[in-house]
């Protein structure tokens, strides 16, 4: 069997290479390396118009919704906090559509940091825009340019618990977190100060969001679990069928991966 195709959401940023300064699709290489080490074939997905989403979902075997800047607070009916990043509306719209389409298609997905926030907001949840206001400290992002490492407690009854066990040390850097949890999501990991560190979509083959950055650490188990789920997922339906309710995926695609 060939490597399953793992789509990784990217963003558009001004970038310089050789003599050029152009808008480019940007993604930290740690994401692609993590997917490769786990046995997948990574593909970076730029923010594209909504009518391209069904075609993308039909061609990938799993989705990684990557980290990045804060999402637009108006998407969960709040005004922006003074510490909230200026939003990237194009990426926000694209990733919400992608995560909803992945859910409809029962496509395995892993949502990381900002990606977990996208998942929560796509399911009607809300965010804490600036954790220090709630916690009284910057313990979850003590350095603006470096990851910190902290402990998380994991529900052993969850899919994530079956991958990681009851506890883990994880690399993280965030000033926002889940507040009200979205419909169908279940919190499955927490820090000692009770910040939600992971959620799972109930009834989904593999639908996990984590607040930390597994692509930055040495523990490959989450990516290995995602790739394993992608290998066993039914083949993708035709693009026109993706936006409906969960549908049967064609055997032709499955044969192409054999």
Regions found by a protein language model. Give the residues of each.
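Hydrophobic, aromatic-enriched interface-forming segments
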Residues: 116-118
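Active-site-proximal beta-strand elements of phosphoester/diester hydrolases
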Residues: 207-212
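Conserved G/P- and acidic residue-centered "switch" motifs that form tight phosphate/ATP-binding loops
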Residues: 113
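N-terminal beta1-alpha1 cap of cysteine-dependent amidohydrolase-like domains
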Residues: 1-110, 120-121, 128, 132-163, ...
């Amino acid at each position: 069997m060939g490597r399953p195709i793992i789509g990784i959401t990217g963003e558009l940023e001004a970038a310089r290479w050789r003599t050029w300064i152009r808008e480019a699709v940007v993604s930290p290489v740690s994401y692609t390396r993590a997917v490769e080490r786990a046995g997948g074939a990574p593909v970076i997905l730029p923010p594209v118009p909504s009518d391209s989403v069904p075609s993308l979902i039909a061609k990938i075997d799993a989705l990684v919704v990557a980290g990045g800047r804060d999402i637009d607070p108006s998407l969960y009916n709040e005004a922006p906090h003074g510490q909230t990043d200026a939003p990237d509306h194009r990426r926000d719209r694209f990733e919400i559509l992608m995560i909803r389409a992945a859910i409809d298609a029962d496509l395995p997905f892993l949502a990381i940091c900002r990606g977990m926030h996208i998942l929560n907001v796509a399911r009607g949840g809300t965010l804490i825009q600036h954790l220090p206001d709630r916690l009284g400290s910057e313990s979850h992002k003590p350095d603006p340019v470096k990851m910190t490492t902290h402990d998380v407690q994991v529900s052993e009854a969850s899919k994530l618990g079956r991958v990681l066990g009851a506890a883990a040390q994880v690399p993280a850097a965030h000033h926002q977190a889940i507040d009200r949890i979205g419909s169908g999501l279940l919190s499955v990991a927490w820090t000692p100060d009770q910040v939600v560190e992971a959620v799972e979509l109930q009834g989904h083959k593999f639908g996990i969001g984590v607040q930390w950055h597994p692509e930055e650490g040495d523990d490959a188990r989450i990516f290995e679990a995602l790739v394993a789920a992608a290998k066993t997922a039914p083949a993708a339906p035709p693009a026109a069928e993706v936006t409906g309710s969960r549908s049967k995926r064609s055997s032709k695609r499955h044969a192409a991966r054999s």
